[in-house]
Amino acid sequence: MAEAKPALEKEAAVKTGSIPSESEDETASHKEGSTSLVSIDEYLAAGVHIGTQQKTQDMMRFVYRVRTDGLYVLDIQSTDERIRVASKLLSHYDPARILVVSSRQYGQHPARMFSRALGTRAMLGRFIPGSLTNPQIHGFFEPDVIIVTDPAGDAQVLKEASSIGVPVVALCDTNNLTSNVDLVIPTNNKGRKALSLVYWLLAREVSRLNDTPFNYELTDFETPL
């Protein structure tokens, strides 16, 4: 993992500056004239930019501003760019060797749909320790790359991935630590609509890059209420 991380992060590097003041609008985080995977309004409506009232030093470079209520807001431009980079990375892997993991309730359905759309493996709900390291465990699997929904909730997965040297792409909120993550996608990883949008975009872009059919709507990825 230690050798893979710099290469992936170098490819995904984004320019960062000081955090804008409270008076600046979230849409200003998007570079003028650039084209995003979906409209900025769609990102905002899904709450992809909504972080938490905690931040880690690891995630500081992805923070756009701090609201007066103490909530950290993520930079939508960084989210869009990282989804592109992650999609390009994943498109180089055999889908059957990709593992998507989610212990979070609102992440399980989008992860399941991502797996269905691309033909990847999925481990949803409680992760059984040893599933990546112990061949005696039922459901043991040796992936080539892993996608996790939340580094905190999926901490055991990160630990095992690190021990076997498998690269990890992770959806990371402002409060996450990223020491065992190879490629960060900064996003709200707790919200129902945010998770569905990010997983839908990843699946759509990987399919596009691999020139394979993608016949799913965003609503197909949304966890039913």
UniProtKB/Swiss-Prot annotation:
Pfam family, one: Ribosomal_S2
One GO location term (cellular component): cytosolic small ribosomal subunit
Keyword list, A-Z: Ribonucleoprotein, Ribosomal protein
Compositionally biased intervals (Basic and acidic residues): 1-13
Ribosomal protein as UniProt keyword: yes
Domain of life, per lineage: Archaea
Keyword Ribonucleoprotein: yes
Biological processes annotated in GO: ribosomal small subunit assembly; translation
InterPro entries in UniProt: Ribosomal_uS2, Ribosomal_uS2_arc, Ribosomal_uS2_CS, Ribosomal_uS2_euk/arc, Ribosomal_uS2_flav_dom_sf
GO molecular function, one term: structural constituent of ribosome
Region (Disordered): 1-33
Family: Belongs to the universal ribosomal protein uS2 family.
Protein name: Small ribosomal subunit protein uS2
Organism: Methanosarcina acetivorans (strain ATCC 35395 / DSM 2834 / JCM 12185 / C2A)
